[in-house]
């Protein structure tokens, strides 16, 4: 991503995975509507799995002592916790599978950490850098796309993949203290281990 961004000349950049399917011609306009506001950092879309359940509706930092996708698996049309899945709102982080940000801000935080966070959590780290700089990251549900990421991704943990993941998890936890991080968008009485926003029992 950093290499690709370095070749661009536009005022804004869009990070977009190659497994994203565009289903609505207005998606980029909807993201730009938020990204051009001066107080905004990164803007992320509402992403569905091919079965139209939610893959991404913002990222909650501290979930699982790291970060998790809000409302993952929620059926299309279900508003989720206080309509979080359906309304534009602040989100401490959003996924880089589909993300728009001003090029100036991308450069300001030195882009994604592709050295210590080569695969996992580099987007969370990127958004946390923007958040720490006083910018507001936004989840924009009016931008809707399909993400052909397998629901079981991450369960395929060959020893070398698991070792890399654990190292990157430790980097995120050490850098941002995510084991104790209190996401202002995630009520303290909600279970930090659950992406479905269930109350603590």
Spans of model-derived segments:
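Short, conserved alpha-helix that lines the donor NDP-sugar binding/gating region
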Residues: 1-6, 127-128
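Short, high-confidence coil segments that cap the C-terminus of an alpha-helix
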Residues: 10, 38-40, 135
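Short aromatic/hydrophobic "clamp" motif used to bind/position activated sugar donors
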Residues: 13
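Catalytic metal- and UDP-sugar-binding loop of GT-A-like glycosyltransferases, i.e.
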Residues: 16-18
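Conserved donor NDP-sugar-binding/catalytic core segment of glycosyltransferases
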Residues: 20-65
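A short, conserved alpha-helix in the catalytic core of glycosyltransferases
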Residues: 27-31, 85-110, 115-144
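C-terminal, non-catalytic tails of nucleotide-sugar-dependent glycosyltransferases
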Residues: 41, 51-52, 63-91, 100, ...
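Short glycine/serine/threonine-enriched helix-capping/active-site loop
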Residues: 43-46, 140-141, 148
């Amino acid at each position: 991503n950093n290499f690709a961004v370095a070749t661009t000349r536009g005022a804004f950049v869009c990070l977009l995975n190659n497994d994203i399917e565009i289903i609505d011609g207005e998606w980029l306009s909807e993201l730009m509507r938020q990204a051009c506001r001066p107080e905004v950092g990164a803007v992320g879309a509402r992403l569905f799995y091919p079965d139209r359940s939610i893959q991404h509706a913002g990222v909650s930092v501290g979930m699982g002592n790291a970060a998790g996708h809000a409302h993952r698996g929620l059926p299309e049309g279900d508003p989720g916790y206080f309509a979080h899945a359906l309304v534009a709102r602040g989100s401490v982080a959003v996924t880089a599978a589909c993300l728009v940000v001003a090029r100036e801000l991308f450069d300001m935080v030195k882009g994604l950490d592709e050295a210590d966070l080569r695969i996992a959590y580099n987007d969370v780290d990127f958004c946390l850098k923007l958040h720490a700089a006083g910018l507001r990251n936004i989840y924009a549900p009016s931008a809707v796309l399909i993400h052909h990421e397998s629901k079981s991704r991450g369960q395929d943990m060959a020893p070398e993949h698991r070792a890399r993941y654990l190292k990157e998890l430790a980097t995120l936890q050490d850098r941002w203290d995510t084991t104790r991080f209190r996401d202002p968008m995630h009520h303290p009485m909600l279970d930090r281990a659950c992406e479905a926003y269930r109350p603590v029992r």
